Amino acid sequence: MIEYYIFYFVVKNYQAIYYLYLLTKKEILIMATAQTQFENFHSKILMGYDDNEPLRDRRDTLIQELKDKLSSDVPNMKFFHQGSYSLHTGINPLNGNPDIDIGIIFECDPNDEDYQNPLKLKKIVRDALNTKNRTVKIKRPCVTVEYLRDGEPIYHIDLALYSCEYGDSDGQTFLARGKETSSAEEIEWQISSARELTGVILNKYTDSSHKKQFRRIVRYLKRWKDEKLGHKNTPSIGLTVAAYELFSANFDFVTGKAQDLLALLSLVNSMLNNWGGDDRLHMYLPVEPFTDLFERMSDNQMKDLKTKLEKLSAVLIEARDQPDTHEACKLLKAQFGDDFPVPDKSETTKSSSSSVVPAGRSA
């Protein structure tokens, strides 16, 4: 054990001496990390579902209503959380109307004659929950319950309905797809492994600090999307899976502190480097049905996404190379919106909020 601590001390001091050497040789860059500001930004945009009592209460009410109102003729149900709630990557929406995604597994075989048409169960759920204090709509992937105040939406809950093979709720599940105006080809039970998706993504990171940085980076991208992309066809789950596939944790070599700016820059550049020969970004679900999460984006929307990612990359590089944290944060605020804090000029110095990297470090 003593030998270990001696070795650790020598290595750490060697690192410090090496950085001092590079500094004297002018082979090192002084840069603003803005880590404090990134973490403050994260605290502002973080959606803490368990702290959102009204939304949590409405979720519990809906689940209880379904248990109470559905007749005994309807197959047994099991509920589970999915989406950003289960991944802990949710953000406060810019214009309000936060949501929770709930999965409902009905213990029925999708080939059962009574439930071959997935719209049957969707209509049963809609009719059970349709009361005067909310609107309930059947959408292609789910049933959406929306709560209004003065005619404006304040919360919504998406209920994704599943059946299970052979009526075994632990077996393969199938998502009820289609709405009442869908064509016959669009109404189907689609094979889906939504329950497994959360574990696949989060189990990739065994280091808790890496997992926390992953979640922060996903939230930054989501808020950036809300600020910069006007179209809804860039799904948040696509950005989350892009991070799952391409994210690399980044921590200071000497101090061990997180460097979210560099981790985000690396991810954005990796996304751009993965643009295909068809001038599109393809990101596939890592579980069945392995769909391309960006397939519904038009070519113009895809072009817009690429252009704005290129701009984000350029701004992140400029902020990285900016020695003054105040100036760096002004650049970042233009990308991430008013919730990104900019410290007073008098509060920032090169020594207080900056880090060092060897010159020529790749973006």
Give the ranges of each region predicted by the language model.
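Conserved catalytic core of two-metal-ion nucleotidyltransferases
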Residues: 53, 66-70, 87, 119-173
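Conserved nucleotidyltransferase catalytic core and NTase-mimicking acidic/glycine-rich helix/loop elements
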Residues: 209-322, 327
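Extended, alpha-helix-rich binding/interface surfaces that flank or overlap catalytic cores
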Residues: 91, 153-219, 357-359, 363
